[in-house]
Amino acid sequence: MSRPLTDQEKRKQISVRGLAGVENVTELKKNFNRHLHFTLVKDRNVATPRDYYFALAYTVRDHLVGRWIRTQQHYYEKDPKRIYYLSLEFYIGRTLQNTMVNLALENACDEATYQLGLDMEELEEIEEDAGLGNGGLGRLAACFLDSMATLGLAAYGYGIRYEFGIFNQKISGGWQMEEADDWLRYGNPWEKARPEFTLPVHFYGRVEHTSQGAKWVDTQVVLAMPYDTPVPGYRNNVVNTMRLWSAKAPNDFNLKDFNVGGYIQAVLDRNLAENISRVLYPNDNFFEGKELRLKQEYFVVAATLQDIIRRFKSSKFGCLDPVRTNFDAFPDKVAIQLNDTHPSLAIPELMRILVDQERLEWEKAWEVTVKTCAYTNHTVLPEALERWPVHLIETLLPRHLQIIYEINQRFLNRVAAAFPGDVDRLRRMSLVEEGAVKRINMAHLCIAGSHAVNGVARIHSEILKKTIFKDFYELEPHKFQNKTNGITPRRWLVMCNPGLAEVIAERIGEEYIADLDQLRKLLSYVDDESFIRDVAKVKQENKLKFSAYLEKEYKVHINPNSLFDIQVKRIHEYKRQLLNCLHVITLYNRIKKEPNKFFVPRTVMIGGKAAPGYHMAKMIIRLITAIGDVVNHDPVVGDRLRVIFLENYRVSLAEKVIPAADLSEQISTAGTEASGTGNMKFMLNGALTIGTMDGANVEMAEEAGEENFFIFGMRVEDVERLDQKGYNAQEYYDRIPELRHIIDQLSSGFFSPKQPDLFKDIVNMLMHHDRFKVFADYEEYVKCQERVSALYKNPREWTRMVIRNIATSGKFSSDRTIAQYAREIWGVEPTRQRMPAPDEKI
């Protein structure tokens, strides 16, 4: 007789291996049915379209979880160096279609839903965007997660699970109105709450100095509960984790100092603690020094570092003890990437843990911290740099302020030794800024506490070394690197533009999807008539589809044969939507002046959100809508010119508009846009670019050849010269008749007859304090736009230029960006090796 199984042997039956999902249509239908009835508890008589979306989402999720568990088991067994990407924003968008693409499930799901009498595209439209970001910085983090999984890195994204993401934008009477984005209202099928990993985060209190060292006591505690979202790589069976923290009040919150009748109030006050993860701050490239925002920044850092250290200590490898207690190996096992200065408190927090709790000597703790952390800078705009008032940090994080002071003292000692007698340099480089309000410069903290500092495009990284971080570069030149941004070709080509992905695959195969440099092979098809025809046909289909979408959603009719001229990005003075407006009015005035002349028809679309407190950005939106009201209702113009403001621009709208674009507007003042990533998405999707030599535009023009790019305007050096000379808008107003006419129209109320002075703030800014020199580039911009129209009249030549752009966009894959971070900052090697599938033996 066989002996009875031990408990451990019995438990071996609990394995993911026996549960591997079969990825065929019959099984998918069966699972869809099971989830509709058993998970959602609905039958077909009462199921809504949203129920069908959820059933499909859960069905697809089933194919993720086996791989997810397997991947995490693999990391535990092999103990690779872990990469921790810390960001206050992850602008994910929708997850369903991206998951199907990366798991190669799309065709089977399409067929299964079709057989069930459902339309998969309609179901995909039901999903809410996860709008946990403002713009480029948050979307970059999402693209990076996709690439890290695709390159087999043991990577984790850490951030905040905001209950309300970026606001929904409604246009009412031409003005932006904000509505709360209640994206979790119906639940989120992609996240898994992990209450068992809840961690305490401390605020306020005071510091006690004991014989054992400093102790942070009498603190208020807020709990951080993690929610995990799977991040699948492209067809390699790797599924990484994005862990977002949600704030919860502890059970004894406000009850310790219980007073009679205070119980109900204490329970109601739990909201105050939980407000930490309530809402994303809607500022892009602007610092707002609010206490709640500082709490958010520390909250994500404190919870994440506890998690990182727990995982480091409980690893299978590295020492004979059941847990690691020695931190010498920490930088060999952990890399922390700071996405801008928002998570910069990771540096003093890691020091606090190592010195106060793990009892390391300061020098050793500092060595570990610097080797572990790296910092990415995203902007040179002074108003965007984080400078926290000392009094705020002192109240909220008293121990961290002491640590920052100590870091500063030791850092300035090094500076003084390297540059004896240079007192002004000490002032410039200090982490502490003296003034009416004493502040901590978080960028300086990040540079001092990191082993690598990078900009996000070549020109931006050079500007950092020559200007805002010049002193730091002179002290430690080895720290400074460039990592030009990229985008994931899975979402931004295969998923959003399947027609184009298909005609490319027909010529060069599918390998380019995980190796975008292969697009170069398309250069041999620049004169291939059938390829030219196919590319043009896909673009026309995308334009028709987007026209139908605009008609259905916004009741606006546009001419699909017109040139689609598109500028979509956050509304900000430096991005110069106003320059675009001046060109539109120029075109309008020219049509009115010579109504019988032939004009290349254009549909100009501008979209983007303005920060709720940014008056000028909101006025810019009002101007765009006012221009549209005049232009679109003028019978003389007809369909030769249309101006559309795209309401509520977000990831899911970008996926529709970018594949339909003919012309991409990337027109920031040279030296202001760190990189840009929208520019790359347009290039990959077959639009031509009109742009300044700024950010990644410089490298895009270099890759494609300047002759395949519409470049105009001042270079960085020209802007500097103009600054030295003094920019005088009046000179341009006096010299350029068309420009003068436009400004006079704006001043006289031509575009706002009911409120003639509506745009006086815009005119006043443009004429008297325009930091971004719109007039200086006006003439060249208009001339460059004339070249665009001339080329558009020759469809074959236009499409050949499009093909050259697509073929040279390979550099701008986030896979390339992440491979460079991996090798040059994190010290790990990317791989395209497949992980075994859940049903395969390891």
Swiss-Prot record:
EC numbers, comma separated: 2.4.1.1
Chain positions with Phosphoserine modification: S15, S430, S747, S748
Residues annotated with N6-(pyridoxal phosphate)lysine modification: K681
Matching CDD domains: GT35_Glycogen_Phosphorylase
SUPFAM superfamilies: UDP-Glycosyltransferase/glycogen phosphorylase
Record PTM Phosphotyrosine, positions in chain: Y204, Y227, Y473
Binding site for AMP: D43, Y76, R310, R311, F312, K313, S314, S315, K316, F317, G318, C319
Domain of life: Eukaryota
One MF annotation (Gene Ontology) recorded for this entry: glycogen phosphorylase activity
GO cellular component, one term: cytoplasm
Signal peptide: none
Chemical reaction(s) catalysed: [(1->4)-alpha-D-glucosyl](n) + phosphate = [(1->4)-alpha-D-glucosyl](n-1) + alpha-D-glucose 1-phosphate
Residues with PTM N-acetylserine: S2
Site (May be involved in allosteric control): Y156
Post-translational modification: Phosphorylation of Ser-15 converts phosphorylase B (unphosphorylated) to phosphorylase A.
Enzyme superclass (EC): transferase
GO biological process, one term: glycogen catabolic process
Regulation of this protein's activity per its record: Allosterically regulated through the non-covalent binding of metabolites, being activated by AMP and inhibited by ATP, ADP, and glucose-6-phosphate. The activity is also controlled by post-translational modifications including phosphorylation.
PROSITE patterns tied to this protein: PHOSPHORYLASE (PS00102)
UniProt key word Phosphoprotein: yes
Record-annotated site: Involved in the association of subunits: C109, C143
Family to which this protein belongs: Belongs to the glycogen phosphorylase family.
Function in brief: Allosteric enzyme that catalyzes the rate-limiting step in glycogen catabolism, the phosphorolytic cleavage of glycogen to produce glucose-1-phosphate, and plays a central role in maintaining cellular and organismal glucose homeostasis.
Oligomer and partners: Homodimer. Homotetramer; to form the enzymatically active phosphorylase A.
Protein name: Glycogen phosphorylase, muscle form
Lineage of origin: Eukaryota, Metazoa, Chordata, Craniata, Vertebrata
